[in-house]
Each structure stands twice: as structure tokens, then as C-alpha cells.
Amino acid sequence: WLKTDPADIICMQETKALKEDVDHTKFNELGYYDYWFSAQKKGYSGVAVFTKIKPDHIEYGTQHKVSDDEGRVLQLDFGDIRIVNAYFPSGTSGEERQQFKYEWLDEFFTYLNQLRLQYPKLILCGDYNIAHKEIDIHDPKGNKKSSGFLPEERAWLDNFFNRQWVDTFRFFHQEPHCYSWWGQRFPSVSLNNKGWRIDYINVTEAL
């Protein structure tokens, strides 16, 4: 896929790979610098950025120990623009992880507000593990009690967007049935487009 030259900067989440286990020459041969922030637990979580433009600065994590141990946030500076690549926690495994997700969201919200004071031009992209509106999920009624579409999670995104963040996809595309994730257990899910839009590229209004 990278050989098709899809973009100058690519942000990936849930890489599940340790940096030392990756053959970096394959990316470098295609003209990409590659940066990885991995979870301490092998085969879990992690984020990576592939870029044809060398960043001015790289920030690993947010100084939140549990989040950083899970390799959830990688940040790169290009001039006066900062890109934040984030893999939000999922709460689907149980109540304990759902509670962790709420705590992570609150702390990350505070972190972003502080970061904007230093970097007015911010790009936040990643797997948020939250579908925002009913248009962003194939069965809103059937999933109203599902992690990823809970009222508290959607309210977090309401509050987030009320802080002058722009949902770049919805800025250009208002049509329904546009999703970014489909369950893998049954092929019919993707064939019938029963998906969720849980991946976002958001920018501050300064951009």
C-alpha cells in the first residue's frame, strides 16, 4: 500500500508491534521516516507515524504513566503545526476498562486544552473508539448501550467539538453510511456496510 504513495504523512494506531521488531529499511526505502511508540505489553496497542517530511520534534506520550505504558499518543512537530496521533482506549472488554476509558478521556481533554496554548495549530487524528452521531453508526438504536456509542462517550465528543475543533471528514461529507470500522467476525458485516465511524482527523480552527 505504501508503494502507491498514498500520503506524505501517515498515522497508524493499534500497531501491536515493538519498534525493535520492525524492519525499518522497508519504510526508509520508500522514502518514509518511521516513528513508533509501543506498549510495554507485547502485541498490544501502540501507534506509529510514517512521514516523508522529517519532523522538527517528536514527543512520545503525554506524561500520563498508564497511557504511556500502553503506547497511546505520539506527537510530531512540523514548523508551527503539531500532529497528535492517538489511539483512544476501548471499553468493550468490561466495566474496568470502560471506567479507565472515561478517566483517560477526561485527562486527555485537559491535556489537549493545555497543548493548544502552546500550539494553536493542532491536528489530532486517530482511532477514538467512539461514534459521535447516529449518522456515524449503522444501528444507533441497537447500539445505544454499547461501548463506543454510550451517551457519556458521545457527550465527551460534543464537548470536544464545542472547543473549536473541526471534524474534517464531516466538513466535506455530510452523507450517511460512511464508516471507518467493521467487525471482523462475520464477512457479511463489511459486505453489508454495517460499520462505525470511530476514526477521525480533527483540526483546530486556526488551521
Protein language model annotation of sequence segments:
Residues 63-64, 88-105, 141-146:
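Surface-exposed cleft-lining segments at the edges of enzyme active sites
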Residues 2-11, 30-33, 106-198:
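Metal-dependent phosphoesterases centered on the DNase I-like endonuclease/exonuclease/phosphatase
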Residues 14-18, 22-92:
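Structured beta-strand-rich core segments of catalytic domains in phosphoester-bond hydrolases
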Residues 14, 172, 205:
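Short secondary-structure boundary segments
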Residues 18, 131-133, 203:
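General alpha-helical segment detector with a strong preference for membrane-spanning helices
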Residues 42-58, 176, 187-207:
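Conserved beta strand-loop-helix elements of the APE1-like EEP
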